[in-house]
Amino acid sequence: MQFSRVLAALCGVLLCASGLFAASGDFCDSSLCLNGGTCLMGQDNDIYCLCPEGFTGLVCNETEKGPCSPNPCFHDAKCLVTEDTQRGDIFTEYICQCPVGYSGIHCELGCSTKLGLEGGAIADSQISASSVYMGFMGLQRWGPELARLYRTGIVNAWTASSYDSKPWIQVDFLRKMRVSGVMTQGASRAGRAEYLKTFKVAYSLDGRRFEFIQDESGTGDKEFMGNQDNNSLKINMFNPTLEAQYIRLYPVSCHRGCTLRFELLGCELHGCSEPLGLKNNTIPDSQITASSSYKTWNLRAFGWYPHLGRLDNQGKINAWTAQSNSAKEWLQVDLGTQKKVTGIITQGARDFGHIQYVASYKVAHSDDGVQWTVYEEQGTSKVFQGNLDNNSHKKNIFEKPFMARYVRVLPLSWHNRITLRLELLGC
């Protein structure tokens, strides 16, 4: 390369000026090159240093660190060089070995979000089981739809039938997902603790052919450690993560009955479904605005302002409510910078005992907050199904993710008043 020749010529001039002269021929005095480099003489008496592996620079005076220094990988991932040129002073390719729960070329994408059992984004119809225990003379049904983390009540979990020798419980995501782990919890039945002590995990793309996660040796099914009481959480992460539409848990050993509450962890398959900052307050109040706000009894102290519209916000006044029930109302989020938006989670609320929520809505997005584009699928504006109660999560995924800084929710139908808590998903 011409640039290399110029540098080499400069090196030669400097060395000669120091009183060091190379012998004639292809090879020159090796003492001119440091760290065991080989000295070569060019046609114009230009000096070149061919550096050994691990060194670079004009006279091999610099340590070659390669593309892994500094580490380009995020979240403490390990950087591995995958190819070199056998010269030792040029490295061209590397990969990042991601820790459990992260994905992406540089492990920049988190993949350990709760997938919807606890919050309700996964509907009852998506949860099934091999059997159900019927308690209290057949009046108590411990069905699979109850197997949601932290569920409360007298009957608050799934329990397999006592006669089921190979019980299982299954979740259908309705689409292929990346699943990175599971959180399990037992429950109390008739005042006595019941839980899974060990279990296996199987996964499937079609709901017919299932494969079990294998142990470290690859010779058998992996048995995961479960719980030790009825209420504490046990988290198990999958390494590697799974790509599946269906996940099954198979109890292996149980304390008294096989009773379970659980949550699955992961992300959308494209790995871009992290919460964008409403629930955790990363997005400041000033970046959440609305067309109007309702005030109970017309008092400012009881205002249902837009900054309250954060998913799972708590308190007596804990959501955004529009001043009027009109399709002209909207709630807007400024993400601060342009983000890739892949989904949305919505939730209603109560106004002093009155259940209120948005039943259907559209979504619009903008780069400048002035010109807006309504989200479309198949050439028409998409109407999303909203909530059915005041507290459950309803998750909708955008089949065509979009890049935007501003996102608006445009309510179309509602129960009682337009009331909303939400989170946006993306990266």
UniProtKB/Swiss-Prot annotation:
Domain F5/8 type C: 111-267, 272-427
Residue span, EGF-like domain: 24-61, 64-108
Membrane association type: Peripheral membrane protein
Glycan attachment points: 61, 230, 280, 390
Disulphide bond pairs: 28-39, 33-49, 51-60, 68-79, 73-96, 98-107, 111-267, 254-258, 272-427
Motif interval(s): Cell attachment site: 87-89
Gene Ontology MF terms: integrin binding; phosphatidylserine binding
Keywords linked to the UniProt accession: Angiogenesis, Cell adhesion, Cytoplasmic vesicle, Disulfide bond, EGF-like domain, Fertilization, Glycoprotein, Membrane, Repeat, Secreted, Signal
Keyword Membrane: yes
GO biological process, one term: positive regulation of cell population proliferation
Major localisation: membrane
GO cellular component: acrosomal membrane; external side of plasma membrane; extracellular space
Entry comment describing in which tissues the protein is expressed: Spleen, lung, heart, brain and muscle.
CDD domains found in the cross-reference section: EGF_CA, FA58C
Record's signal peptide: 1-22
Family annotation (SUPFAM superfamilies): EGF/Laminin, Galactose-binding domain-like
Cellular location(s): Membrane; Secreted; Cytoplasmic vesicle, Secretory vesicle, Acrosome membrane
Role played: Contributes to phagocytic removal of apoptotic cells in many tissues. Plays an important role in the maintenance of intestinal epithelial homeostasis and the promotion of mucosal healing. Promotes VEGF-dependent neovascularization. Specific ligand for the alpha-v/beta-3 and alpha-v/beta-5 receptors. Also binds to phosphatidylserine-enriched cell surfaces in a receptor-independent manner. Zona pellucida-binding protein which may play a role in gamete interaction. Appears to participate in the O-acetylation of GD3 ganglioside sialic acid.
Domain notes: The F5/8 type C 2 domain mediates high-affinity binding to phosphatidylserine-containing membranes.
Designated name of the protein: Lactadherin
UniProt organism field: Rattus norvegicus (Rat)
Gene: Mfge8
